[in-house]
């Protein structure tokens, strides 16, 4: 009698994806983040579903419905803060996952990589729309400022912004559609993740050496399931510590003030995970130029396969490229810090320098350093 795990049409797919999947024997903890992102997505969908049961997408009651969730619903405060901080964990893992891909040359799998870029854009859109839902000051003004950027598009811009708003300003119609999209997008993300995994399993995983590992594979279960559970426990420890001890650490105090179109907060800024892109946007004095730089700061990821000039896939044995990658990480941290600062000297010039170096490192320094390393190795 054949094993049901290997013969049942549905269970067979799960078996080939998570149990009998041949995996390289040397993949490190950096390969944990994919499964952690999956867990984060599931947590966000579950907590979000429970929040949606009590939330009302109306400008007059949205803020008070969030207050009601925190005060009157059983463990509502826990669900709300787990959802808000879960989003932060999601982005931390997302950035680690992308960093891993760049370091080990995983972008060579073109379909998987481009699917990942589509995923990050979708996740960013979802998080942005979720931020507008509590209808606090930063929700309202963040939504106003970011959607208003589309007015920089020549000819159709102003009409497009009014079409997105559903009126002449961010109002009830905007909040309702943001809620609708914020609810549906995680399910679309789940479908995109399935495609991302489908493409990955066509080629198999990369590994730290960057070499072909077909001659040395081990089953995913039990080796990597146990390894992933360790990562999962560490993630839950971090998330629960954040949620239970300092739930507002990563939030903005302005969002505890109900939205008021007549009172602008002194510093309008998005959530911390968008600050690097926000700093790039603000560093260019021209509106259209800023929007293009903002878009390109994310879409630049699609160029990585074309910019790879090294004869080696991974950065494991390329110390000069490693230095540049860590320089890029430091640069992104500086951009994140600048994005949260007011637009005044010296922050303006620091932001401009950090924005220029961000694009220079990726577009010029990394490819030329790779060529230099080829020369040093006489390749």
Swiss-Prot record:
InterPro entries hit by this protein: Cyt_b/b6_C, Cyt_b/b6_C_sf, Cyt_b/b6_N, Cytb/b6-like_sf, Cytochrome_b, Cytochrome_b_C_euk/bac, Cytochrome_b_N_euk/bac, Di-haem_cyt_TM
Residues reported in the UniProt entry to bind a ubiquinone: 201
Membrane topology, from the record: Multi-pass membrane protein
Chain sites annotated for binding heme b b562: 83, 182
UniProt: heme b b566 binding residues: 97, 196
Signal peptide interval: none
UniProtKB keywords: Electron transport, Heme, Iron, Membrane, Metal-binding, Mitochondrion, Mitochondrion inner membrane, Respiratory chain, Transmembrane, Transmembrane helix, Transport, Ubiquinone
GO cellular component terms given for this protein: mitochondrial inner membrane; respiratory chain complex III
GO terms of molecular function: metal ion binding; ubiquinol-cytochrome-c reductase activity
Cellular compartments annotated: Mitochondrion inner membrane
Binding note for cofactor: Binds 2 heme b groups non-covalently.
GO biological process: mitochondrial electron transport, ubiquinol to cytochrome c
Keyword Heme found: yes
Record-annotated membrane-spanning stretches: 33-53, 77-98, 113-133, 178-198, 226-246, 288-308, 320-340, 347-367
The protein's required cofactors: heme b
Family: Belongs to the cytochrome b family.
Cited function: Component of the ubiquinol-cytochrome c reductase complex (complex III or cytochrome b-c1 complex) that is part of the mitochondrial respiratory chain. The b-c1 complex mediates electron transfer from ubiquinol to cytochrome c. Contributes to the generation of a proton gradient across the mitochondrial membrane that is then used for ATP synthesis.
Additional facts recorded: Heme 1 (or BL or b562) is low-potential and absorbs at about 562 nm, and heme 2 (or BH or b566) is high-potential and absorbs at about 566 nm.
Assembly information from the UniProt record: The cytochrome bc1 complex contains 11 subunits: 3 respiratory subunits (MT-CYB, CYC1 and UQCRFS1), 2 core proteins (UQCRC1 and UQCRC2) and 6 low-molecular weight proteins (UQCRH/QCR6, UQCRB/QCR7, UQCRQ/QCR8, UQCR10/QCR9, UQCR11/QCR10 and a cleavage product of UQCRFS1). This cytochrome bc1 complex then forms a dimer.
Record-given protein name: Cytochrome b
Organism (species): Thrichomys apereoides (Punare)
Organism placement in taxonomy: Eukaryota, Metazoa, Chordata, Craniata, Vertebrata
């Amino acid at each position: 009698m054949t094993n049901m795990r290997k013969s049942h049409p549905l269970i067979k797919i799960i078996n080939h994806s998570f149990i009998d999947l041949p995996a390289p024997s040397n993949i490190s903890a950096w390969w944990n983040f994919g499964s952690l992102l999956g867990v984060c997505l599931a947590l966000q969908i579950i907590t979000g579903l429970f929040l949606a049961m009590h939330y009302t997408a109306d400008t007059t009651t949205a803020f008070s419905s969030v207050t009601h969730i925190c005060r009157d619903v059983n463990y509502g405060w826990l669900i709300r803060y787990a959802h808000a901080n879960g989003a932060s964990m999601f982005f931390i893992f997302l950035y680690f996952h992308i960093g891993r891909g760049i370091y080990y040359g995983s972008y060579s799998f073109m379909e998987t990589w481009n699917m990942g870029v589509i995923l990050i854009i979708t996740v960013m859109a979802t998080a942005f729309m979720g931020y507008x839902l509590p209808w606090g000051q930063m929700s309202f003004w963040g939504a106003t400022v970011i959607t208003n950027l589309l007015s920089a598009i020549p000819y159709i811009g102003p009409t497009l912004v009014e079409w997105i708003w559903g009126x002449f300003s961010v109002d009830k119609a905007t909040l309702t559609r943001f809620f609708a999209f914020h609810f549906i997008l995680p399910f679309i993300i789940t479908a995109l993740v399935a495609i991302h995994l489908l493409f990955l399993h066509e080629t198999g995983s990369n590994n730290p050496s960057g070499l072909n590992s077909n001659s040395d594979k081990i089953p995913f279960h039990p080796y990597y399931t146990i390894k992933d559970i360790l990562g999962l426990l560490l993630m839950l420890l971090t998330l629960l510590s954040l949620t239970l001890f300092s739930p507002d650490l990563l939030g903005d105090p302005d969002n505890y003030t109900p939205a008021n179109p007549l009172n602008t907060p002194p510093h309008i800024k998005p959530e911390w995970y968008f600050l690097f892109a926000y700093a790039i946007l603000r560093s260019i004095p021209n509106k259209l130029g800023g929007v293009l730089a903002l878009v390109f700061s994310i879409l630049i990821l699609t160029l990585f396969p074309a910019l790879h000039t090294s004869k080696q896939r991974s950065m494991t044995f390329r110390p000069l490229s490693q230095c540049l990658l860590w320089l890029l990480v430091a640069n992104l941290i500086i951009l994140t810090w600048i994005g949260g600062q007011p637009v005044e000297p010296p922050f303006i010039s620091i932001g401009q320098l950090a924005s220029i170096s961000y694009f220079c490192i990726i577009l010029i320094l990394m490819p030329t350093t790779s060529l230099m390393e080829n020369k040093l190795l006489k390749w």
